[in-house]
């Protein structure tokens, strides 16, 4: 009998979340730069945020007209699995030799520095490519400075290697829609767009990530770039999933493999950091930090055992964790356990572990078997 831990990915949930994200773009009324049709791409970098990039790309075939990944290696893997949807490289090319692969595989690239521009202009390509010019409007991580952006645009637009140029930027505070930097970033890219919008090479703007798409309609433009929300995870705080129409796609589950009674004053787990305050029943679950559950999760982290919520008890081990099930009913060896999923939002677990849901789902190891449903 195999170890009872699994990661189940509901591909229909991803499809429904994408449809919701797309509807937000289509229905947006407040954007002052949305002079073209609003489109929605699917960000599936980091193995679709741990959900499986190939399975996600297949599930969104016919829905998402464009996929986005971080590197050419991720794009090559998708093409090797017969994914034909156009793909955008969010970090562009890391060396000039990759540009021939971009041509061959029908990829689009982000340009975020002057060297990438020079490398592209110096190449002899079989056909021109679609370029996304990333402008640093305040994130200060990647992007052409605003002061140099018009020159960069002109360089790209005048090259025979470029068939179109999309302006893009990335928000530093989109999860705080009232932050003044967010408005400043939108205004900066708007001003640049106004200067080049009449150019034949101008393809539009791409601004909104998940948080901006959900909370800042004025950021919705030609291409919206939802990532985390496609997987049913709120880009805001851990409680928002209860008010957003998002469906968690990943369920991390296992089973109870042992039950024991612990007397008042006795401890559980490494370091003896949890002590029973009354006679307790402790369930040992086959899941630990070796499976992707955060070691930093504190006692009290919610766990669902046989449909009931109970608190984590003690330190998480590599292969196991313990839950105080004293107050629960009908618990036995073999009882099902949800560590996160449709009933326990991953953001809730992340908050108890002083991290983000993004980190938890993207760092899942291969030890737990993956099961895809609703393909």
Swiss-Prot record:
Leader sequence residues: none
Residue sites binding substrate per the record: 141, 318
Catalytic activity: L-alanine = D-alanine
Enzyme Commission number, as recorded: 5.1.1.1
GO BP: any one term: D-alanine biosynthetic process
Source species, domain of life: Bacteria
SUPFAM superfamilies membership: Alanine racemase C-terminal domain-like, PLP-binding barrel
Reported cofactor(s): pyridoxal 5'-phosphate
Active site location: 45 (proton acceptor), 270 (proton acceptor)
Keywords linked to the UniProt accession: Isomerase, Pyridoxal phosphate
Record GO terms (molecular function): alanine racemase activity; pyridoxal phosphate binding
CDD domains: PLPDE_III_AR_proteobact (cd06827)
Any one GO cellular component localisation term in the record: cytosol
InterPro entries linked: Ala_racemase (IPR000821), Ala_racemase/Decarboxylase_C (IPR009006), Ala_racemase_C (IPR011079), Ala_racemase_N (IPR001608), Ala_racemase_pyridoxalP-BS (IPR020622), PLP-binding_barrel (IPR029066)
Modified residues (N6-(pyridoxal phosphate)lysine): 45
NCBIfam families noted in UniProt: alr
Function in brief: Catalyzes the interconversion of L-alanine and D-alanine. May also act on other amino acids.
Record's protein name: Alanine racemase
Species for this entry: Pseudoalteromonas atlantica (strain T6c / ATCC BAA-1087)
């Amino acid at each position: 009998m195999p170890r009872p831990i699994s990661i189940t990915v509901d591909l229909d949930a991803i499809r429904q979340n994408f449809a919701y994200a797309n509807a937000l773009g289509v229905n947006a009324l407040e954007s002052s730069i949305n002079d073209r049709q609003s489109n929605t791409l699917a960000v599936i970098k980091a193995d679709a945020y741990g959900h499986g990039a190939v399975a996600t790309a297949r599930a969104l075939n016919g829905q998402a007209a464009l996929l986005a990944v971080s590197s050419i290696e991720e794009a090559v893997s998708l093409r090797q699995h017969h994914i034909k949807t156009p793909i955008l490289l969010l970090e562009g090319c890391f060396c000039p030799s990759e540009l021939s692969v971009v041509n061959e595989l029908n990829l689009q690239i982000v340009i975020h520095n002057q060297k990438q521009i020079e490398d592209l202009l110096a190449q002899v390509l079989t056909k021109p490519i679609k370029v996304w010019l990333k402008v640093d409007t305040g994130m200060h991580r990647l992007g052409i400075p605003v002061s140099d952006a018009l020159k960069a645009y002109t360089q790209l637009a005048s090259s025979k290697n470029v068939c179109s140029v999309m302006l893009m930027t990335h928000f530093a505070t989109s999860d705080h829609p009232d932050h003044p930097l967010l408005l400043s970033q939108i205004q900066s890219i708007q001003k640049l767009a106004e200067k080049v919008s009449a150019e034949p090479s101008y393809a539009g703007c791409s601004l909104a990530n998940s948080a901006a798409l959900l909370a800042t309609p004025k950021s919705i433009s030609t291409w919206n770039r939802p990532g985390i929300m496609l997987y049913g995870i709120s880009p805001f705080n851990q409680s928002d999933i209860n008010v957003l129409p998002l469906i968690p796609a990943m369920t991390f589950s296992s089973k109870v493999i042992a039950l024991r009674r612990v007397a008042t004053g006795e401890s559980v787990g490494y370091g003896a950091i949890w002590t029973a305050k009354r006679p307790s029943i402790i369930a040992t679950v086959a899941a630990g930090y070796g499976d992707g559950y955060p070691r930093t999760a504190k006692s009290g982290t919610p766990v669902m055992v046989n449909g009931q919520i109970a608190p984590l008890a003690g330190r998480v081990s590599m292969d196991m964790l313990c839950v105080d099930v004293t107050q629960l009913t009908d618990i036995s060896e073999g009882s099902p356990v949800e560590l996160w999923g449709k009933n326990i939002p991953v953001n809730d677990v992340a908050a108890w572990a002083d991290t983000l849901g993004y980190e938890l789902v993207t760092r899942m190891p291969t030890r737990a078997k993956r099961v895809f449903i609703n393909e």
